[in-house]
């Protein structure tokens, strides 16, 4: 059978419709689905007995699971994978939901990027009713956008570094020699001429020694300023922070009525290293279902992530973690819309 341009050799049209109906029903109800339910609720034009036989075949093919011989069936990881890859139609958001996302992103435009993506994670948790996770940008592949030294008194300046990703770093520098306003202005100009648009990873001690040699007249101040600038620049340079929102949203899902399962989930998301490894991605939208997650603790979860970018350069990841029974179509639609708006904001250089 040809679906979305892809031939599914082992499936006929009737099996596809029955599988779609079962997945749709199970996502909505969280109850194993029987043949009588499908026959009553979905106009498939076949009897309950025929549906039962087809469901048995789908189970043999690995698309469905049956917990008990007397119970209905539910989708397997393989069934969900076929659904999201070939059968799912992306749900269109309401105009109110689209407006809420756009307004939320626009209102966060005055913040630095780390705050913006955390705000995006909060609206994602609110709309999806799932636990959301965001990985903040690393500075290592970024460049310095501006350097500002602000005089606090004759022997003290505040260093403010702005990275092109929107990250802002600051530090207070104590000077051994007093500095006038004119000297402060000149040193600000020197630092911005020499370091502006330079990649962070290119700035090392040798580079700063060259700057010191080139501007000997200002050495008595630069020898205090440059080491602190270097230290400030390197602090957390290659660390992607992980932020979570909506951890208690899992209790909206009956899967987590099981106390042990809920504890396991909360333990998983509390392990930032595990979460970081789980959500790393280079793709626009990535969906990992159940056993596709290589970490054992996440093998009954689905993780849907998207990469947000600065002028087409990947910065970090944002996504959701929840049970394999989740409203995939709606979540993908919300996440896609959110990341599109986030990318527009960053591309417009508003941060």
Curated annotation (Swiss-Prot):
InterPro entries documented for this protein: GAF-like_dom_sf (IPR029016), HrcA (IPR002571), HrcA_C (IPR021153), WH-like_DNA-bd_sf (IPR036388), WH_DNA-bd_sf (IPR036390), WHTH_transcript_rep_HrcA_IDD (IPR023120)
Key words, A-Z: Repressor, Stress response, Transcription, Transcription regulation
BP term (GO), one: negative regulation of DNA-templated transcription
Keyword Chaperone: no
GO terms of molecular function: DNA binding
UniProt family annotation: Belongs to the HrcA family.
UniProt function note: Negative regulator of class I heat shock genes (grpE-dnaK-dnaJ and groELS operons). Prevents heat-shock induction of these operons.
Protein name: Heat-inducible transcription repressor HrcA
